[in-house]
Amino acid sequence: MKFNKVKLVIHACVLLFIIISIALIFHRLQTKTHSIDPIHKETKLSDNEKYLVDRNKEKVAPSKLKEVYNSKDPKYKKIDKYLQSSLFNGSVAIYENGKLKMSKGYGYQDFEKGIKNTPNTMFLIGSAQKFSTGLLLKQLEEEHKININDPVSKYLPWFKTSKPIPLKDLMLHQSGLYKYKSSKDYKNLDQAVKAIQKRGIDPKKYKKHMYNDGNYLVLAKVIEEVTGKSYAENYYTKIGDPLKLQHTAFYDEQPFKKYLAKGYAYNSTGLSFLRPNILDQYYGAGNLYMTPTDMGKLITQIQQYKLFSPKITNPLLHEFGTKKYPDEYRYGFYAKPTLNRLNGGFFGQVFTVYYNDKYVVVLALNVKGNNEVRIKHIYNDILKQNKPYNTKGVIVQ
């Protein structure tokens, strides 16, 4: 009997120990959950993702584009020969006087599967997407929904910083915000922008030019806040659909998956695939895929005043060194003395555009390399366009 009592006491103690242990573990888990920074919490589908899922429910893959190339035209024959001899791996599109004159693929879209680049291949345009963000920003200005000189805190009241940051400084990359550091922990644009606000301003860089993806991520969030719509919806309803850019898509749009180029880079063991694993946080600054022909189509339509009036378009495209456009860089692109330029490089893919009133040259590659050397040779040496185009300090009407 005595032995049974001892046994019962031991069992009771063990049971009590188990209950206390479970309670402590539960308490620690609860504390840990509540202490997680909201930036790092897993979220449901973002507004951008919801919009794209709904949009693509009934959408099918776009119609195939045909190769455009006239071997009888000496300059285009020379461009083709040059791209082949330089082992170019990508696609090219060239518009001359608003007409598509060349559209051709070289090398492979997917080396593992042996899928070749064609005019249908869509490339990750990286920072060239800032041009689209700049256009959306400009549209909101012209609609009097924003003032480019207002502080960002007027539109995002929670975006508090040690010094005021006008939207214009974000657009010109002179906000002073610390360089954006992407993280796999950030699952959407909101989390990325909260992280940017949390890091704040580098006093040494305030009001000084420093290229920073973070500036355009914040602008993308401002666009969302002002319109009450996701960045993706703004892009499609204000640019993509009106201008019929049917071979452009965000990184996660299923109907376009088979056309998306994979990016590569050479390392000590050979060619390596660079997986783009942070694009969910890059709305506004680097998660758009385009064919070179669609980018050329976008630019030619802007030149033809299909997005803005001549009064807005001409200064936007040509002025620099003036009060309104003090720098070569504005709204995601450069206006330089001999050309206008867009460029983006992300996860082994490089997307570069040179253009003037006669030619739009778009060169996209998906094996990391120097795209600038090739496009300069095509634009300056073959097409002979190294001549005055924009004049510093001249106000354009």
From Swiss-Prot:
<dbReference type="InterPro" id="IPR001466">
    <property type="entry name" value="Beta-lactam-related"/>
</dbReference>
<dbReference type="InterPro" id="IPR050491">
    <property type="entry name" value="Bact_CellWall_Synth/Modif"/>
</dbReference>
<keyword id="KW-1003">Cell membrane</keyword>
<comment type="function">
    <text>Catalyzes the liberation of D-alanyl moieties present on wall teichoic acid (WTA) and lipoteichoic acid (LTA). Affects the methicillin resistance level and autolysis in the presence of Triton X-100 as well as the cell wall structure.</text>
</comment>
<protein>
    <recommendedName>
        <fullName>Teichoic acid D-alanine hydrolase</fullName>
        <ecNumber>3.1.1.103</ecNumber>
    </recommendedName>
</protein>
<dbReference type="GO" id="GO:0071555">
    <property type="term" value="P:cell wall organization"/>
</dbReference>
<dbReference type="Pfam" id="PF00144">
    <property type="entry name" value="Beta-lactamase"/>
</dbReference>
<dbReference type="GO" id="GO:0005886">
    <property type="term" value="C:plasma membrane"/>
</dbReference>
<keyword id="KW-0732">Signal</keyword>
<dbReference type="GO" id="GO:0046677">
    <property type="term" value="P:response to antibiotic"/>
</dbReference>
<keyword id="KW-0046">Antibiotic resistance</keyword>
<dbReference type="GO" id="GO:0016787">
    <property type="term" value="F:hydrolase activity"/>
</dbReference>
<feature type="signal peptide">
    <location>
        <begin position="1"/>
        <end position="23"/>
    </location>
</feature>
<keyword id="KW-0472">Membrane</keyword>
<keyword id="KW-0378">Hydrolase</keyword>
<dbReference type="InterPro" id="IPR012338">
    <property type="entry name" value="Beta-lactam/transpept-like"/>
</dbReference>
<keyword id="KW-0961">Cell wall biogenesis/degradation</keyword>
